From Swiss-Prot:
Family statement: Belongs to the glycosyl hydrolase 22 family.
GO molecular function ontology, one term from the record: lysozyme activity
Keywords in alphabetical order: Antimicrobial, Bacteriolytic enzyme, Disulfide bond, Glycosidase, Hydrolase, Signal
Protein name as catalogued: Lysozyme C
Organism, as annotated: Callithrix jacchus (White-tufted-ear marmoset)
InterPro entries in alphabetical order: Glyco_hydro_22, Glyco_hydro_22_CS, Glyco_hydro_22_lys, Lysozyme-like_dom_sf
Signal peptide: 1-18
EC number: 3.2.1.17
Domain C-type lysozyme: 19-148
Length: 148
């Protein structure tokens, strides 16, 4: 009986945590989705962004009390501009998706929305974490040894 309870708790924690990618696994996945060089942005920059925004966690969320928005998923895409969570006042939903779609282990929708974000004039500078931790820095460490 104790084994079943422990197993249940372990499975529940995995479900709540979502998928946390290994660094090279994510690098290969993002490359397969066409992010390497997309809009002139290197794969290493995308990896740096994902590291600092979510620590490679698909279920990461962050509430922003100022505008009552929430950042979602591996790229921490914001509900004020890019997705619909049904709670953010004045939301634009430029990616035309539910914010919950950004929390899936399958990051297809998250990648598609990230591509939409960088098509705007700000490009990758839309992400504060990228500006703080990746811009004008050697980001090669994020793909080093991954064979991508």
């Amino acid at each position: 009986m104790k084994v079943l309870i422990i197993l249940g708790l372990v499975l529940l924690s995995v479900m709540v945590q979502g998928k946390v990618f290994e660094r090279c696994e994510l690098a290969r996945t993002l490359k397969r989705f066409g992010l390497d060089g997309y809009r002139g942005i290197s794969l290493a920059n995308w990896m740096c962004l994902a590291k600092w925004e979510s620590d490679y966690n698909t279920r990461a969320t962050n509430y922003n009390p100022g505008d009552q928005s929430t950042d979602y998923g591996i790229f921490q895409i914001n509900s004020h501009y890019w997705c619909n969570n049904g709670r953010t006042p004045g939301a634009v939903n430029a990616c035309h998706i539910s914010c919950n779609a950004l929390l899936q282990d399958d990051i297809t929708e998250a990648v598609a929305c990230a591509k939409r974000v960088v098509r705007d004039p700000q490009g990758i500078r839309a992400w504060v974490a990228w500006k703080a931790h990746c811009q004008n820095r050697d980001v090669s460490q994020y793909v080093q040894g991954c064979g991508v």
